[in-house]
Regions:
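Short glycine-rich, flexible loops that bind phosphorylated cofactors or substrates
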Residues: 117-118, 123, 143
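Conserved beta-strand signature within the Rossmann-like core of class I S-adenosyl-L-methionine
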Residues: 132-141
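C-terminal alpha-helical "lid/dimerization" subdomain adjacent to the S-adenosyl-L-methionine
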Residues: 140-151
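Conserved acidic residues
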Residues: 43, 107, 132
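Conserved N-terminal segment of class I S-adenosyl-L-methionine
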Residues: 1-102, 112, 122-125, 129, ...
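A short SAM/SAH-binding and catalytic strip from SAM-dependent methyltransferases
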Residues: 108-119
Length: 192
């Protein structure tokens, strides 16, 4: 198990995230996450841990125009803004009280490959507005920047039960490496 890393850690690996959306190794995750979003495009999609904006590009191509990307990595945000000039991106940390207060006015959240990186994942999720629609993804494999990983999709539900409502949830398992048995779990849910 790894440790929670500062923004600079992610900045040093930005090159591997500069691949165009169409060739991204996370493309399947992005496509499933977009499919699991609420059908209405009236609400702003808040993408926490937006990285280089590849998911934002998919949303734009699908007709979404209300989007806010948040990341604490300056390098990732610079690329996200360059890649998606029509969307808004801000620098922020999930532990920043001003960011948490700002998020209270939104109702649709996406956290792709975020929760495994933060120590206080439950506290952060608990701070989001009740009744919000959410799409989350987490891996079943370890990394030096992962503070946790989940061996099975049921472990995800067990960890966040009580904070997130998974009733009626669609659960998607994406195999990222057959040889290594790596998977990413994508789930839609509601904040309790």
């Amino acid at each position: 198990m790894g440790t929670e890393m500062p923004a600079e850690f992610y900045d040093q690996f930005i090159d591997r995230h500069l691949i165009p959306f169409e060739k991204s190794p996370w493309r399947k995750v992005y496509e499933e996450a977009a499919r699991l979003l609420p059908e209405s495009k009236d609400e702003t999609i808040v993408d926490i841990g937006c990285g280089t904006g590849r998911f934002a590009k998919l949303l734009y191509d699908k007709g979404y125009r209300k989007y806010l990307g948040i990341d604490f990595s300056k390098g990732m945000l610079e690329e996200a803004k360059r890649y998606n000039p029509s969307f808004t991106f801000i620098e922020g940390n999930v532990y920043d009280e001003a960011i948490v207060r700002m998020l209270q006015k939104y109702h649709v959240f996406v956290l792709l490959e975020v929760l495994e990186h933060i120590e206080k994942d439950k506290a952060f999720l608990s701070s989001l507005p009740q009744g919000s629609d959410m799409v989350i993804s987490v891996p079943n494999y370890d990394s030096r920047a992962h503070v946790r990983h989940f061996k099975h999709i049921d472990e995800v539900i067990e960890r966040y039960d009580g904070i997130l409502d998974f009733q009626g949830t669609e659960k998607v398992v994406i195999k990222t490496s057959e040889r290594l048995k790596n998977e990413i779990y994508v789930l839609n849910c509601k904040k309790r």
